[in-house]
C-alpha cells in the first residue's frame, strides 16, 4: 500500500561519528596510510608559542586543502560548504559533527599572510615523497620528465607588448669553450663574445597578460593559444610516484629548465637516475650532452625529417665518423672547414667539385657556389642516444612513457583540477602543482599500504 509521509517529526538522536564513516572509505585509508604529524614541525616557526589568540590547528587547514585537491574541489568557498555537509570530510579534518569548518577566508588569509614567504606546499610534497621512498615505492633507476600546459586565470585578449630582459642560455660558456678549442685546432681565431647574448642585459619584446603578468603566451603548433603556465614533472617508473615538480611560464622552452630539474631530482632522491625518458620535444644535442655528462642514459623520442625544401636536406648525406666527413649522393666527400659561433661544424667540398656536379640544381640554390652541411659539436651524444633508443631495451623504456608520465598528467587534469590555474601568479601556481602532486603520491601510498595486507 502506498504511503506518503506528510510531516517530519523532530527528534534527538545519539550518534557516534566514527560509525558514520564507512571502514572502507578512501579518507579512512588515507588517514591510516599517511603520517600527517610533520605539518606541526613545518608550521611551528610561523606561530607564536606563548602569546596571542589560539589559532586554528594548522593540520586541520592542510587536511581541508588536501580534501579539496583529492576530490577536485577548486573553490575554497565550495570546499568550506562541502566539509560542513559531508561527514567523511569532517571526520578526516578532525572536526566534530557539530563543528563548523573554518571559513574560506581563513584559508586565503593564511596563504596571503602566514604562508606567503615560505615553501609550505613544496615541503608537504617533499615529506609525502620521503614517506613514499621509505615504503620502497621509488626505484630511482628510470625516470620520465615531460611538461604540460595549464591555462592561466587570464583573458587571452587582455594583453600588452612589453620589453623583457634576455637571460644568457645556461650552456653558453661550455659551448663557447668547445667552439674556441675547435677553431684553434683549425688555425682560426676565437670569436669575440662581447655581445649581449653572452653578457646578459639584452632585451626582447613579449606579449604579456595584463591580468596575470607572470604567465606566458603560448603560440606553438598543436597547442592552444593564450596565456598558460608549464608544469615540468618527473615521475619514477616503479610505482608512478612523482619525484619532482618545476613550474615555469609557458613561453619558456621545455629544454631550458632541464639543468635545474636534474639538480632538484638529485637533491630530492639523493642520486640521479640511470635512464631518463623524454619525448621528441627534448630531442636536441644539448640535452643529450647534458644527460651524458651527468652519467644518465637518455631515451628520447626521435624527430622525423620534416625537410620540404626544393633542395637536398642533410639526411641525404651520410656521415663517416672514422674520417669526420660527410658523403654526398654523388660519393663526394665534404670535409670540416670551420665551426660557427652557434656551435655548428660546417662541412663542404671545393667549389669546383660542386660546380660540375650533375645534381647541382637539386642539391643547393643558384646563389651558392657549393653545398654546406652543418653538424653540432655535441651531435655525437645525440646519435648515441638515438642508437640506444632504437635498441630493444630503449624501445621498452620509451614505451612506458604512456603508462607513467602521460598517465600522471591525465590523472592530475581529469581528477584533481590541474587543467586550469586556481589563482593568479607563479607562486600560487607552484602551490597548486605541488599539492596536486602530493595528493597523487598519497594515492600511491594508500595503494601500497593496502597491498601489503
Model-derived features: positions:
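Short alpha-helix boundary/capping elements
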Residues: 38, 69-72, 87, 91
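Short secondary-structure boundary/capping segments within folded domains
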Residues: 18-20, 53, 223
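Short glycine/serine/threonine-biased micro-segments
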Residues: 50, 92, 423
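Basic, short loop/linker segments at the boundary and entry of helix-turn-helix/winged-helix-like folds
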Residues: 23-66, 376-377, 381
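Short, solvent-exposed coil/turn linker segments
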Residues: 16, 34-38, 94, 161, ...
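N-terminal catalytic cores of NTP/NDP-binding nucleotidyl/phosphoryl-transfer enzymes
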Residues: 60-68, 74, 79
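Anion-binding and metal-coordination hotspots
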Residues: 3-4, 72-85, 95-453
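Hydrophobic alpha-helical membrane-insertion signals
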Residues: 1-28
